[in-house]
């Protein structure tokens, strides 16, 4: 059988622990037998990041900007315990944070729907994609404790030397806490364009929600920028694609989403997206059944699983014990990247392969073959659940793929 050829390389970012093991198995069993895989490889494993003083992460991010499509394995973001465990030179920053900073991207997370794994919200029959703005707000805040009798103010020092002072609160009767947070027009504009472009790419309605009735300057700025960019650049494109852009308040959005059948992109500010993405993931089944793609406003895509490195299973693996680690999200990271590479290069054969592998993965589960984490939540009349170990599950997917 002739392997599928690739004309443009895919940026491949390897990772850590159990997901690194699955990464190699996926390539061996599901990809290289069928594709003449063309990747520009970067080892983002923690030891290699340390060896290169994290230069490899920056190189991978800029390669993604150059080639337009990347696939990333889950990686360790070191804390103090990891610094000691790996004898690191320093506590390196999150690789995801570095890639986001270079691409100025927005993270889109979407559940993988399987017949037999029901959403906890019965009406949710189609995926809900969460688009989370990954910059600023409370995640880049400054905050302090305030003594009784103190007064808190915002001071804005103008470039002309003038200062604008706004009182936040006079803590005359009690001590308390205060924080300051920010965002930038540039970042909000990038967020908006990423959301509009992705909605056009996947042909889904886009919802955006803030609390502009209460936050009449901060949240209203988000609303205005989205509205201005939509009307100036995307209104006609959305109409041609048969999709809609819809703005509402965040509390109304929550109520609408719960009542909906799904099938939309829900764009959220940073904190809202952090909370709602976990809520949606849990309601649909698990983080191991969520896709994640980082999209830059200039059209670069980085695909990855929405979960971590599965440390507990990795330590079992090192002891020679059997593991049953869910690889579905990592498989879909590969298929998402291959599909996008195929679309950009006009390589229909590669695109069709990726779609077929996704269908084979879902069909394998629907036929009763799955990892142990899914076994307890899968219920389908006439289907017997047969839990598989990590590699056995991938072998079953290959068997399904070959018989399709």
Regions found by a protein language model. Give the residues of each.
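Flexible, glycine/charged-enriched surface loops at secondary-structure junctions
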Residues: 35-41, 202-210, 234-247, 342-354, ...
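N-terminal glycine-rich phosphate/adenylate-binding segment common to multiple enzyme folds
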Residues: 47-164, 271-275
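N-terminal alpha-helical transmembrane segments of multi-pass membrane transport
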Residues: 2-8, 18, 22-23, 28-52, ...
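Glycine-rich phosphate/nucleotide-binding loop
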Residues: 257-356, 363-367
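Glycine-rich phosphate/diphosphate-binding loop of Rossmann-like nucleotide-binding domains
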Residues: 6-25, 154-248
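Internal helix-turn-beta structural module
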Residues: 319-325, 343-404
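N-terminal small/polar loop signature for handling phosphorylated ligands or for N-terminal nucleophile
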Residues: 46-60, 223-264
């Amino acid at each position: 059988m002739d392997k599928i050829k690739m004309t443009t390389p895919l940026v491949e970012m390897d990772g850590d622990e159990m997901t690194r093991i699955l990464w190699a198995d996926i390539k061996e069993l599901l990809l290289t037998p069928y594709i003449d895989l063309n990747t520009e490889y970067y080892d983002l494993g923690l030891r290699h990041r340390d060896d290169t003083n994290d230069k490899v992460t920056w190189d991978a991010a800029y390669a993604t900007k150059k080639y337009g499509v990347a696939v990333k394995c889950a990686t360790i973001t070191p804390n103090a315990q990891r610094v000691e465990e790996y004898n690191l030179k320093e506590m390196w920053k999150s690789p995801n944070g570095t890639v986001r900073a270079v691409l100025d991207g927005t993270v889109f997370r979407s559940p993988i729907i399987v017949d037999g794994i029901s959403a906890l919200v019965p009406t949710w029959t189609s995926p809900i994609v969460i688009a989370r703005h990954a910059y600023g707000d409370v995640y880049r805040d400054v905050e302090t404790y305030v003594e009784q009798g103190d007064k808190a103010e915002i001071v804005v020092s103008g470039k002309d030397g003038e200062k604008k002072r706004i009182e936040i609160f006079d803590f005359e009767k009690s001590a308390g806490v205060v924080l300051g947070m920010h965002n930038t027009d540039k970042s909000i504009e990038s967020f908006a364009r990423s959301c509009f472009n992705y909605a056009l790419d996947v042909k889904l309605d886009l919802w955006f929600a803030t609390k502009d009735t209460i936050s009449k300057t901060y949240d209203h700025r988000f609303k205005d920028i989205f509205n201005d960019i939509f009307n100036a650049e995307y209104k006609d494109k959305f109409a041609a694609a048969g999709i809609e852009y819809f703005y509402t308040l965040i509390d109304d959005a929550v109520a609408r989403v719960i009542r909906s059948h799904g099938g939309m992109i829900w764009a959220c500010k940073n904190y809202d997206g952090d909370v709602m993405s976990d809520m949606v993931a849990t309601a649909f089944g698990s983080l191991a059944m969520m896709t994640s793609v980082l999209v830059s406003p200039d059209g670069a895509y980085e695909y990855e699983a929405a979960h971590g490195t599965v440390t507990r299973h990795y330590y079992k693996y090192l002891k020679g014990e059997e593991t049953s680690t869910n690889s579905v999200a990592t498989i879909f990271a590969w298929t998402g990247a291959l599909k996008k590479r195929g679309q950009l290069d006009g390589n229909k054969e590669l695109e069709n392969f990726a779609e077929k592998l996704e269908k084979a993965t879902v069909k394998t589960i629907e036929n009763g073959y799955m990892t142990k984490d899914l076994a307890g939540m899968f219920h389908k009349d006439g289907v017997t659940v047969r839990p598989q170990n990590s590699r056995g599950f991938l072998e079953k997917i290959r068997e399904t793929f070959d018989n399709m």
